[in-house]
Amino acid sequence: MRAGCGALAALALALTGFSLPSLGQAGPVVQVDFSNPGLSPSHWTLIIHPDGSAHFHSERGNAPSATPQNSDSIRLVVPDQDRDLRLSAQFARHVFEAARNDKWFNVKCESHRKVAFQGWKRLSYSGPEGQGSCEFNYSNDEEIEALGDSMVSVANTILEGARLEMLLQHDRLGLDQEIEYIVEAQGEGRVQQICAIRGILARLADDPGVMERVRKRARLLLEKKEE
């Protein structure tokens, strides 16, 4: 599931916690929790509201530390993240439509098929209609599987944005390889909702202190419309 970023609305709402009951008091939310101890971050949470305001929290886990000076920029380990962000209203609408179509996630979504482990994805809904959640590595439900893939791609976007911020501060030459990777990943669908990192892309596009090729690619990402 891919949706365009559209025009940015007001700044994302500040969130005070991650438990569904407390968030439910402020309106319906969809939350996805991802965990895979073999990856960095090993765990992340993405909370989405119907208007596209969202919050992302990640924990690096036991991955070895890395810095821009001694690491391949594409594999640069990102420190724990805790940030508000803005997704498109169209994307948020698709997310909540999927939740409604799948009984607010009150379904069995794990296929139990012998497939490669990609990471546990727990989809949860809390709102006026009630609460529900389901967890899976791979789901036979095409809509749930696609939603899980989209959430992972959005998380990838947020983490790539964090890498750009680190490289801008510590290793500007590394920006060239990193932003080339993002352009390629977007074309393949491995990153979605570029509007989530609009801030750092705009900084790169306007910064005369970075390579012109980096600035050009940042502008390309800002201008390209996702479908």
Q: Which positions does each model-derived feature cover?
A:
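Bacterial N-terminal signal peptides
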Residues: 6-17
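A short, surface-exposed interaction/processing loop segment used at functional sites
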Residues: 54-69, 152-165
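Charged, amphipathic alpha-helical segments
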Residues: 88-112
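Positively charged n-region of N-terminal signal peptides that target proteins for export
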Residues: 1-4
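A short, structured loop/turn motif at beta-sheet edges
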Residues: 48-51, 85-94, 125-131
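N-terminal secretory signal peptides
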Residues: 26, 35-67
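Short, well-ordered, aromatic-rich surface patches in folded extracellular/luminal domains
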Residues: 20-38, 105-227
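Acidic/histidine-rich, surface-exposed loop or edge segments in extracytoplasmic proteins
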Residues: 56-83, 182, 199-200
